[in-house]
């Protein structure tokens, strides 16, 4: 039995390796992993079929060698398939990372472009003129009783005078002498201001509604009341808030002064009351001492009482100063005349 120097199975395997290495399609592997696996399976099946046909043609004498060589070829194919799978996986991971990095780069560029669009130069912002305040204010000198701010706003807006931005009403201050109300808790307002978004609307509202009835439903609460309003030319809401703040500060200052005066009067009253109490206590103690002394002296009790009753207090009188044109001699003559007249009368 002769041995061959040239091994056909090994040549087939090496040629297959070379063909596979030379014919590896990277683009197909990037497109789909499943397609590469399918191609590899079909190649392995074809190689197996070719090896089986060669085994049958080689004869029975070479059966053992062909089996061992076929087993080695299968192992090499298996290792080669594992290596290809690993390479495909690594290629897929690399492609995924590349795609992710590209996406992040694109998003970063888009965000930078948006930021540049939204960013305005500082010179334009500084040189930009302020918006003009085109609002108009209408003053209401009198209001219907128990009319609330939102009710006033709705009455004006239903007549087409809108939009209304702000409403301010001054609550009525009841004098302290007025009788106290118990049943009705609704507030009344003396006057008010309404700010319109447009000067034109404010002027038209004041011209059309002034000195007219409120109207509305015939049996309404404010139907017969009359509007009293005037458009304030050149008057802004900031001016109103400034005047209100000034008046509020003045009221608070007056209240503080009145409180300080009341505290001072109260302090003086308490001091006088305490002093009077102290004097009363001293007088009571003196009377008790006097009674004890009189009790010690049996016969002098009545005299002590009379002296206590007839006690007279003496006060030092100030002398009247004479003027420059008057003398003491003139005063004596006047006193003599008065004495003579009084003597004739009495």
Curated annotation (Swiss-Prot):
GO terms for molecular function: RNA binding. InterPro entries: ABT1/Esf2 (IPR039119), ABT1/ESF2_RRM (IPR034353), Nucleotide-bd_a/b_plait_sf (IPR012677), RBD_domain_sf (IPR035979). Keywords: Nucleus, Ribosome biogenesis, RNA-binding, rRNA processing. Residues 14-29, 52-68 have a biased composition (Acidic residues). Residues 1-133, 281-346 are annotated as: Disordered. One of its GO terms (cellular component) is nucleolus. Gene3D superfamilies: 3.30.70.330. It is found in: Nucleus, Nucleolus. SUPFAM superfamilies: RNA-binding domain, RBD. It comes from the Eukaryota. GO terms for biological process: endonucleolytic cleavage in 5'-ETS of tricistronic rRNA transcript (SSU-rRNA, 5.8S rRNA, LSU-rRNA); endonucleolytic cleavage in ITS1 to separate SSU-rRNA from 5.8S rRNA and LSU-rRNA from tricistronic rRNA transcript (SSU-rRNA, 5.8S rRNA, LSU-rRNA); endonucleolytic cleavage to generate mature 5'-end of SSU-rRNA from (SSU-rRNA, 5.8S rRNA, LSU-rRNA); small-subunit processome assembly. The keyword Heme does not apply. Residues 136-226 form the RRM domain. Residues 281-305, 316-328 have a biased composition (Basic and acidic residues). Involved in the small subunit (SSU) processome assembly and function, and in the 18S rRNA synthesis. Required for the early cleavages at sites A0, A1 and A2. Belongs to the ESF2/ABP1 family. This is Pre-rRNA-processing protein esf2. The lineage of its organism: Eukaryota, Fungi, Dikarya, Ascomycota, Pezizomycotina.
């Amino acid at each position: 039995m002769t041995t061959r120097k040239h091994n056909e199975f090994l040549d087939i395997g090496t040629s297959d390796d070379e063909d596979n290495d030379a014919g590896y399609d990277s683009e197909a592997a990037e497109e789909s992993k499943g397609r590469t696996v399918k191609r590899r399976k079909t190649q392995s099946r074809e190689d197996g079929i070719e090896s089986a046909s060669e085994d049958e043609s080689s004869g029975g004498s070479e059966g053992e060698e062909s089996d061992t060589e076929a087993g080695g070829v299968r192992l090499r194919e298996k290792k080669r398939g594992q290596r290809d799978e690993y390479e495909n996986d690594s290629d897929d991971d690399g492609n995924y990372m590349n795609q992710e990095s590209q996406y992040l780069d694109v998003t970063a560029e888009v965000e930078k472009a948006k930021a540049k669009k939204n960013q305005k130069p500082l010179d334009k912002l500084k040189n930009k003129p302020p918006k003009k305040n085109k609002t108009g204010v209408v003053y209401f000198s009198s209001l219907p009783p128990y009319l609330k701010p939102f009710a006033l706003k709705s009455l004006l807006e239903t007549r087409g005078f809108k939009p209304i931005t702000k409403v301010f009403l001054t609550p009525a201050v009841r004098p302290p002498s007025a009788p106290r109300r118990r049943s009705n808790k609704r507030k009344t307002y003396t006057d008010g201001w309404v700010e319109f978004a447009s000067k034109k609307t404010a002027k038209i509202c004041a011209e059309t509604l002034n000195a007219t009835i409120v109207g509305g439903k015939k049996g309404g609460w404010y139907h017969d009341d009359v509007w009293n309003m005037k458009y304030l030319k050149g008057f802004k809401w900031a001016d109103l808030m400034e005047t209100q703040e000034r008046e509020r500060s003045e009221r608070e200052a007056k209240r503080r002064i009145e409180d300080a005066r009341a505290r001072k009067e109260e302090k003086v009253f308490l001091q006088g009351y305490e002093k009077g109490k102290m004097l009363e206590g001293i007088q009571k103690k003196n009377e008790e001492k006097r009674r004890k002394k009189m009790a010690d002296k049996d016969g002098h009790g009545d005299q002590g009482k009379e002296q206590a009753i007839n006690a007279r207090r003496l006060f030092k009188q100030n002398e009247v100063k004479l003027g420059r044109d008057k003398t003491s001699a003139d005063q004596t003559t006047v006193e003599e005349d008065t004495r003579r007249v009084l003597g004739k009368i009495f």
